[in-house]
Amino acid sequence: FKQKTAYEISLGLVGSEMCIRDRVMTAPFGSTDESSILHDDLRTDLFGEQKDGLTNIASRFKHEIGDIQKAFEESEIIIEKEFNTATVHQGYIEPMNVTAHWNNDSRVHIWISTQGPFQIREETARALDMRTSQIKVTPMEIGGGFGGKFPLYQEPVAVLLSQKSGKPVKIIMTRKEVFEGTGPTSGSYVKCKIGATKEGKIIAAEGYLAYEAGAYPGSPVEAGGKCMFACYDIPNVLVEGIDVVVNKPKTAAYRAPGATNSTLATETIIDEIAKKLSLDPIDFRLMNASKEGTRRADGPKFPKIGCTALLEAMKSHPHWNSPIEGENIGRGIAIGFWFNGGGPSNCSIGVNQDGTINLVEGSPDIGGSRASIAMQAAEVLSIDYKDVYPSVTHTDNLGYSGGTGGSRTTFATGWAAIEAARDVKQQMIARAAKIWGIEEKDIELKNGIFISNSDSELKLSFKELASMLIDTGGPITGKGNISPTGVGGSFAGNIVDIKLDDETGKIDIVRFTAFQDAGKAIHPSYVEGQMQGGSVQGIGWAINEEYFYDKDGDLKNSTFLDYRMPTSLDLPMIDTVIVEVANPGHPYGVRGVGETNIVPPPAAIANALYDASGIRMNVLPMSPAVVMENLLNNS
């Protein structure tokens, strides 16, 4: 007797028919005519237009500047290679979980560890055909996200179960469910071709990218294409890419999504050209580095950026100038680019009678953003940052705020805090003017003191004035609502020394120095923490991590025991160098620092491996088995 599963029973109830199709596991295969068609209604989108014919290619893009064909004809050295990267997961420690409570007033309260509470509210309402105002989402302290905790997963199910049961319902994914059911980042195929003159000027670059979207459309392939050659001032560029559905979990963001894959190709070829031209790899990059006014292939020109300053910092660092000692030791470098996001952010600031302030914002803190946001508000109000008490609130308390991702939080939500603090400052000046009976324009806030410019005897500290608010017109609350567009961008670089075990193919990281342009490091130790964390994840991506599927398409390493992420036992201390080239699109020059740091490590490690062994790798991860195979073939 075989007991039927709930799934089998449900198939019988609804009279379903199942059509078994051949698996599609990679983007290159999924884009061919030989592959199975996974969706009966999917057609390729090209800049908003749907193309005829069923396909697994969900979308296609193309960016071009200059005359690429002529530029390659004029190039004196051309290198073209193909690269493949495996599917990898963000590896957050806390699994997906949600608690929902359907109340008697037909409103539902959701508690969830998410990077985007307002997005969860909107998507849950859309999924369940509810009004947005019926749903309140409270973001909890989040145990890691890295871009992977934006999508909607169990929330609608928990809401419906709570409605039916009349009780709160909590759902927690197992680790296996996290790996198999939530969004990893894309596996990819990248083809890269770069042409240069004998003097070392890059004049042509071409890229083709095919990224896995998972079961449904939406890979970061276009972002990868925009970042692919962004570090360099190249007059002739062509980048094309496709988003391909495959039989894997629907992808989600992972720190600078798409950029790490494409940068592996660009930076290893850049390194190879430098070697063939007998040029120092940093000098070669400096000769061709993007600067203010450089136009990217997708159109925009860079404002003031820190690419050359970053490379100069790398060139002058003791790590670069120290000797390489020991057998099978190699040194490599790479640089990378990622955008800063803007988007809507809201913040409110309330002044307390003791002179402290409560700052309320709607973007969850997953990297110390509460501290950096509070410090920006304190700067405006000329008070001690310890007097600012920041908190992240639920969706009923504040206007719509974008989530914590895209390197936007310290930048955009910090800017909202600046605007709220400016509102408080102006209201405090107006209150002081009312108390003193003078014009507002006659009052300034200096070093925490409100001072009359015409009468030096008229002055009140921030705390003194705060204590008088209730009796002189009532409390003061400031509002900040902003959606910045001048968001800039960030560059990161690595110098890495590796040791290769030529008997096993194992790569050990001996020394690692991370560089990043932070614009203005509001909280330097938190910036360093972000740089170190992203670097470690980039190292894991380079040498350990991958989704391993068997011939039947089943994931075989869906636990932390089998999905090998680096730990402190595998790594040296990650040294950090913060470069500060102020972002002209922010009041304090801030650039996002949470993502760019994951972009260059795989390429830097691949270049170090070449320096140690003479072999060029074009796959991720560079696991011992893959490296050993290349060593044997090379010998």
Residue spans for each PLM region:
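Short, exposed "boundary/linker" segments that immediately precede the start
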Residues: 1-9
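Amphipathic, heptad-repeat alpha-helical segments used for oligomerization and assembly
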Residues: 257, 408, 579-597
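Cytochrome P450 core scaffold surrounding the K-helix E-X-X-R motif
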Residues: 519-523
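Active-site "cap" helix and flanking loop/linker of ATP-utilizing ligase/carboxylase catalytic domains
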Residues: 525, 529-562
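C-terminal substrate/ligand-recognition segments
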Residues: 540, 593-618
